């Protein structure tokens, strides 16, 4: 499979996990997903009262500078780790 196909499959599989991952695991996946699909963060940091938006922004911002290909590979690895941990 191509890296893009692996990524697309992993993104679909993560939605089917039997148990919801922890918030930290979800933030890690979110940051890698956005870096894979959009690239470096391109939006303003949300206000401090938007806790969920700020957490997502921080997760994505931590991946800044990572190439889309490396982010895809890291996302697939993390997804496989979560599938092993939580099952489909």
Swiss-Prot record:
Expressed in which tissues: Brain. Is selectively expressed in glial cells.
Single GO term (MF): fatty-acyl-CoA binding
Annotated ranges, domain ACB: 3-88
Protein keywords: Endoplasmic reticulum, Golgi apparatus, Lipid-binding, Transport
GO cellular component: endoplasmic reticulum; Golgi apparatus
Alphabetized SUPFAM superfamilies for the sequence: Acyl-CoA binding protein
Function (record text): May play important functions in the control of brain and pituitary activities. May regulate GABA neurotransmission through a paracrine and/or autocrine mechanism. May not bind acyl-CoA esters.
Name by which UniProt lists this protein: Acyl-CoA-binding protein homolog
Organism, as annotated: Pelophylax ridibundus (Marsh frog)
